[in-house]
Amino acid sequence: MTESMADFFPEATLVNIAVAPYHFSEVVVQHYNSLLCLSKLLSAVHGVFIFENEVAQDLCRSMRRINRPTLDDINQTMSSNILPVLLPKFRGGGPCQRHSCLSNDIADLCPHPQYKFLDVKHTPQTADASVEFTFDSWSALLKNIEYMQAAGTASETHASRQRFGANKPANYVNMSSLLILRGLGASEAASECITSMRSSRSIRHAVWSDTGDYYSVCTSPFYVNGYQRSMTLVSNGQTIVPYLQRLLMKATEMFRVGAYLHQYTAVNGDLQVDDFVDSFRSLGQTLQDYRSLGS
């Protein structure tokens, strides 16, 4: 369907949201499905927002205090993370302030056709009953975002464990980043947040980018998800590497012994072995490109 839309609307900016399946599930061919899907999306769209079921479920339990999250709870958590990216927002301030549309955001976040995977981190995230009592300062929200980015996780709980634990944060390198501030005093706080990030080098960018710290920033005075202040970081960088490594390793193990290929080549008849080879080559090259951001 996405390929058809790309054919019908060649000038449009196309963006997809892909949800990575659980690491262990009852669907034995999930790694094949993810491989084929992501490799096709890379050639058809301008950007792909990646979410993981495991991370969303952990957010439900650790941050929203839902002991037994349902599918609706998990979907709501993902939706609340992507919502600040899609809602109207502005760039600049004063008379230079202008509306920032999604196509502009994607152009900044994905300036190279080989780098299209986008990661979203959002704070705060609390239990529903605590939302109206949450009044984090902009500096506190920025610290949360920095810890989450350094740890490569969308969960504040996991970021805190790495911060105070024995394991050193991975400190992933980005190609580009978009920081979104929404709520009370967002426009006034934007420049201070960017200055703080640049001075601390808390969010790293590839050495070959124009300034070495390729940020875009958007603001909106309106609340989102009920919070007086909230902050979202969209990054295009190495946080995707662990997932791609795991996906390619599992899919390669199955492909090497020919496991379940008949379900695609014989039963459905729409795919051939060469299609798998092309997908491995495409996603493998993408993984290598993201790894090279840090070199």
Each model region followed by its residue ranges:
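Terminal, contiguous helix-loop blocks that mediate binding/assembly
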Residues: M1-S295
